[in-house]
């Protein structure tokens, strides 16, 4: 089974998103994190489906989720390393 590893930045991105949304709706915050992690697990099974982002880093790829967040990741032999979860409105 393909593995998903999260960098410290990616873990902090999830926590920041959860804390921001949980102020108003903890259930929605939980669902967002679940959706992002589910998308990362899908990417681990098919890591080449994301868009190549060589202008940012060699080997880096991005994937738009069904949420307002993009996943930036590096494909690995047996999965992916998630570098960041970034809101689409963020530079």
What do these predicted regions represent?
Residues 1-3, 74:
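Non-catalytic interaction surface on structured domains
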Residues 3-60:
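Basic, Lys/Arg-enriched alpha-helical interface segments
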Residues 18, 62, 72-74:
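Generic alpha-helical hydrophobic packing signal
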Residues 23-26, 62, 83, 91:
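Short, low-complexity, polar/charged sequence segments that are solvent-exposed and flexible
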Residues 64-66:
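A short catalytic or substrate-binding loop motif that flags glycine-/basic-rich loops and adjacent residues
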Residues 68-91:
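Enriched for short, Lys/Arg-rich terminal
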């Amino acid at each position: 089974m393909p593995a998903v590893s999260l960098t410290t930045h990616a873990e902090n991105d999830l926590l920041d998103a959860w804390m921001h949304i949980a102020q108003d709706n903890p259930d929605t915050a939980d669902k967002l994190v679940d959706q992002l992690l589910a998308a990362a697990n899908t990417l681990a099974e098919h890591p080449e489906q994301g868009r190549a982002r060589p202008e940012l880093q060699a080997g880096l790829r991005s994937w738009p989720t069904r949420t307002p967040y993009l996943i930036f990741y590096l494909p690995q032999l047996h999965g992916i390393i998630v570098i960041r979860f970034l809101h689409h409105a963020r530079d």
